[in-house]
C-alpha cells in the first residue's frame, strides 16, 4: 500500500481505561469498582495473581507518561474518569473532590502537551456497591445513578473537554459476566444480560440529554463499541443467515438504537421467543429515538467468522450461538499468542458500513493493538524489544483507516491500545500491548 499523508484534522493517539492503568492509589474506603470486586473474589484465576491494585500506576506517573506521549507525536489521549473514584458516595451523589483535582490535572497535562483529551465516562468501572445493591446494570436504579454521575462530571469539565463517550465496549462485561459466565459475576443468565444491555443503552440517552446544555461549548457525546465485523463462511444461504444473526446479536443490538433510534424488530422477536426480553417503560423507546449520539468510537482487534450450525445447540439456557457456530478460516493471518485473526481490511468494511447504513456519522478507531506474550524473546542486545510485528500491525490498520476516509467515510482518527503495557482482565500482564514496556518489578 502506498504511503499516505495524515490529514491535519486526523487525530493520532493512544487509549486507556482507568482500572487498567491507574491502580487504586488515592481511592478511599468504599470506592472499589467492578474490577476490584472481580479480582478480590477470584484472585486465583488472574495471571500471576496480579490484579488492579497497582496496574501500571498511571496515578503516580501521569505527568511523565503524557509528556512522553506528546514526544511520540500523539495528538490525542483517551482515558477514563473512573466512576468509582469520582464519587465518594455513588448512591447519595457525593463527589470526591480529591478525584476531581486529580482528573483536572490530567486534563491540564494533556492540553499543556498539545493533545486533545478524549474521555470515556464508563469503561467497566461501575462502583462495586451497585453490584451489591442492584445487581449492577441489571438494576434500573443504576441508570439513574449513572445519570447523576455524568451530570457531576460534565459540570466540572465541560469547558476543558469536547470529546466525550458515555461507554467503552458496553457489551463486553455483560456478555462475559452474564452470558458466558467467565467474568464476574460468573452467571449464565441471558435474561439478565439483555436487561443490562438495555439499561446501558437507556443510560446513554440520559448522558446525551445531560450533554445538551454544553453543546454550545462544542461538546459532543458518543459511545465506543467493540464493533467486530461478522463474515460468513460462504455465500450459501444458511451461512449468510448465520452471519445475519451473529451481527444482529453482537453488533446491531447497540448500533441500531444508538444510530437509528430503535432496536431491530427481529432482535426483539427473538428475545421474546427465547424468554429473554428486557423490562422497559414505553417512554424509554421514545428517549432512545430522540436522544442519539453524535459520534462513534470503534474498538477493533479481530473479525468474527461464522457458519451455519452443524449440530443443534444443546445448552440449557439461551445463547446467540443457538443460530450460528464460530468458524476458523484456513490459512488466515493471526496472532498466535492470542489466537486472534489479523484482518486489516475489516477497517474499510466498518467504515463503509457506517457511511452507507448509518448516515456517515463521524467515527474513529478508538482502540487497535496487538497483545504478545513473552516479548522478552524479542529483546535485542541494546535491551530494547524489536517489535516489528507491532509496527506492521498498527501500520496496516492505520493505512486502512486513512483509505476508508479517502473513500468518503467520516473517520477522524486512529488510537492505539496502548501507550504502556496495561492490565487486562484475568490475563493481567500476560499479553503486552504497550508502545512502551512496563517493568513490573520497578514500575
Predicted regions and their residues:
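Glycine-rich, proline-tolerant flexible connector loops at the mouths of alpha/beta enzymes
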Residues: 81-95
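Active-site region of glycoside hydrolase catalytic domains
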Residues: 2-46, 70, 90-91, 100-443
